[in-house]
């Protein structure tokens, strides 16, 4: 979870691209300026920026160091949500709390499976999915989730 505001250049963008959820203030300015310094992004932007935005959308910014605003970052799929200036941290905490309501084992498995899809390809990710599902279905949290649904109450997950 990341909340960004103000100027988010180079390493800031690289850190942001490593996050699962990015909440951006409407006034943020982004840029991968490395090519203007004689180097290239080395924290993953050459992969993650392209992966999020697509080759044709990412390259003009990576190859030139041109900066862009929050609206463009949203269009490029680099941020999850844009909020009013000054509300980014509050909103990030709200989203984090929403995630914390979910079963921790399920969240961990979901992130691992999604990462498999991105890093190993969808075929391998589908093949590995049972490795995540079997322990989940056998977990106390899965039993609690079903009970809570039948009893029409919020589940109380324990990460077991």
Where in this protein do the model-derived segments appear?
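C-terminal long alpha-helix characteristic of the crotonase
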Residues: 23-28, 70, 79-127, 134-140, ...
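Hydrophobic alpha-helical segments typical of transmembrane helices
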Residues: 45-48, 57, 69, 106-109, ...
């Amino acid at each position: 979870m990341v909340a960004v505001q103000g100027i988010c250049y180079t390493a800031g963008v690289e850190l942001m691209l490593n996050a699962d959820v990015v909440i951006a203030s409407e006034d943020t300015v982004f840029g991968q300026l490395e090519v203007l310094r004689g180097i290239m992004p080395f924290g993953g932007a050459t992969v993650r920026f392209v992966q999020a935005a697509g080759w044709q959308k990412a390259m003009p910014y990576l190859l030139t160091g041109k900066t862009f605003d929050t609206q463009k970052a949203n269009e490029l799929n680099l941020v999850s949500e844009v909020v009013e200036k000054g509300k980014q941290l509050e909103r990030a905490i709200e989203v984090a709390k929403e995630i914390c309501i979910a079963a921790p084992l399920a969240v961990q498995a979901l992130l691992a499976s999604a990462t498999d899809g991105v890093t190993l390809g969808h075929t391998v990710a589908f093949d590995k999915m049972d490795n995540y599902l079997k322990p989940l279905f056998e977990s106390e949290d899965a039993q609690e989730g079903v009970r809570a649904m039948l009893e029409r109450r919020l589940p109380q997950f324990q990460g077991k």
